[in-house]
Amino acid sequence: MSREQLSLEIIEAGRFLYGRGWSPATSSNYSARLSASEALLTVSGKHKGQLGPDDVLATDLAGNSLEPGKKPSAETLLHTQLYSCRPQVGAVLHTHSVNATVLSRLTTADHLVFEDYELQKAFSGVVTHESQVVVPIFDNDQDIARLAAKVQPWLDTHPECAGYLIRGHGLYTWGAKMSDALRQIEAFEFLFECELKMRAVMNR
């Protein structure tokens, strides 16, 4: 896929995610693999519902901008580490929904477990509701290199992992294609909303 096509996918993802309320204002960041050694990412500080072609830039997998004058998101390393350690990943999405933010703050454990939901089959590799989808939760950290170092061991030991939460911050998920990552965002958001409603009903 060409750079122009990948950029358009990122722009369209931004409009969709903003429209669903999962990427308010200038929050969130999105990316797509450009080559084996490069990625396209959203430029820092841009409104995700109003992205244009100039709001996307190329970086290397160390997170360095390859386009003078354009600054990538501060969280670029969390994208590029996925492209580095998982060759099959073609797109990464990071969102800041209310459900993801609140649920990650309410959960004192370092992970969430979802089971017996039919929608679990929306995740790549999951073929039955009779399984578990485990979502790790990492404490927020302004030092992104340090945060990435905490995430890496989980990625290394859990190849089935489809996404993770940063406490009080948001969700990261990914897929072979942008459409896969978007599908998983929707599935995660459904599960997060179900979990919050279950907790409210059960007063826990």
From Swiss-Prot:
Q: Cross-referenced InterPro entries, in alphabetical order?
A: Aldolase_II/adducin_N, Aldolase_II/adducin_N_sf, MethylthioRu-1-P_deHdtase_MtnB
Q: Which GO terms describe its biological process?
A: L-methionine salvage from methylthioadenosine; monosaccharide metabolic process
- Its EC number(s): 4.2.1.109
Q: Which GO terms describe its cellular component?
A: cytoplasm
Binding positions for Zn(2+) per the UniProt entry:
94, 96
Q: What Pfam families does UniProt report for this protein, alphabetically?
A: Aldolase_II (PF00596)
Q: Name one GO molecular function term.
A: methylthioribulose 1-phosphate dehydratase activity
Keywords for this protein:
Amino-acid biosynthesis, Lyase, Metal-binding, Methionine biosynthesis, Zinc
| Designated name of the protein | Methylthioribulose-1-phosphate dehydratase
| Gene name of this polypeptide | mtnB
Concerning NCBIfam families, the annotation shows:
PRK09220.1, salvage_mtnB
Give the enzyme's main class according to its UniProt record, as a single word. lyase
**Organism this protein belongs to:** Pseudomonas syringae pv. syringae (strain B728a)
